[in-house]
């Protein structure tokens, strides 16, 4: 175990500075198209929405981040394509949109047919899970800019205007249904890599909680895609949705100005216990960085909560309160 408390900011990712950069980038984005293609939401939600007649088109863009560096270490790239799809699709699902098409962007230091084939394998698998088509993309060879590779993509979805879910219906007393993650997913990997480095571990060594796999393989488990959320939307009165990704539970603030009280949270998986122990990371930093076992959240009336939990393999984890974000007695914000 590392003697000092490792943090995301110390590893090089300062969320507050990142938010400042985003604000500086978007402050001047004032032009808005009218008619078909007019924006229906402001910048800052999980996905952007534009007018398309009876429907709203939804767009999200995201990448795999520094998880690709672990794929390089393991020389196994057939799962990061799933991650790329998942990060975008889950953001569309978080506003109630169904994914319909995808384009990818792959930036390379150098060409390799085996590498490219594995990337494509993951993208195809992710698209199949998401029931959508990959309709194009861009591959750029940038040896002076890229060390290794970077993978990102943009996803297009659609939803009837009256069925958009952006959190306005969330009310005091609404119930929180959490859906489990299957690992770290695709956020917080700068801190993950720092923990592995500082604790003296190797990605190729056995994972202490399951010696049938390695640390690297455990960290490369692809991000879960939550397509079952669309079925819940059809059968339940869903008031709000959240994809638990970067900044952990902090991103819940974009859903509603009300608070979240997680009285019975999903138990974090062994990979989170390992990272916390080896990195000497405190509870607050863990919940502000990682999904901590819960990859998606559904907010809905108590009458529909059990049904939603049953449909997704999730559980009731808490309720909407007046303010704050709490996990048991831990104040997140």
From Swiss-Prot:
Pathway given in the UniProt record: Purine metabolism; IMP biosynthesis via de novo pathway; 5-amino-1-(5-phospho-D-ribosyl)imidazole from N(2)-formyl-N(1)-(5-phospho-D-ribosyl)glycinamide: step 2/2
UniProt keyword ATP-binding present: yes
Pfam family, one: AIRS_C
GO molecular function: ATP binding; phosphoribosylamine-glycine ligase activity; phosphoribosylformylglycinamidine cyclo-ligase activity
Enzyme Commission code: 6.3.3.1
GO BP term, pick one: adenine biosynthetic process
Protein keywords: ATP-binding, Cytoplasm, Ligase, Nucleotide-binding, Purine biosynthesis
Gene Ontology cellular-component terms listed: cytosol
Compartments, record wording: Cytoplasm
Listed InterPro entries: PurM-like_C_dom, PurM-like_C_sf, PurM-like_N, PurM-like_N_sf, PurM_cligase
Catalytic activity entry: 2-formamido-N(1)-(5-O-phospho-beta-D-ribosyl)acetamidine + ATP = 5-amino-1-(5-phospho-beta-D-ribosyl)imidazole + ADP + phosphate + H(+)
Enzyme class: ligase
Family, per entry: Belongs to the AIR synthase family.
PANTHER family associated with the record: TRIFUNCTIONAL PURINE BIOSYNTHETIC PROTEIN ADENOSINE-3, TRIFUNCTIONAL PURINE BIOSYNTHETIC PROTEIN ADENOSINE-3-RELATED
HAMAP family assigned: AIRS
Protein name (record): Phosphoribosylformylglycinamidine cyclo-ligase
Source organism: Methanococcoides burtonii (strain DSM 6242 / NBRC 107633 / OCM 468 / ACE-M)
Gene this protein is translated from: purM
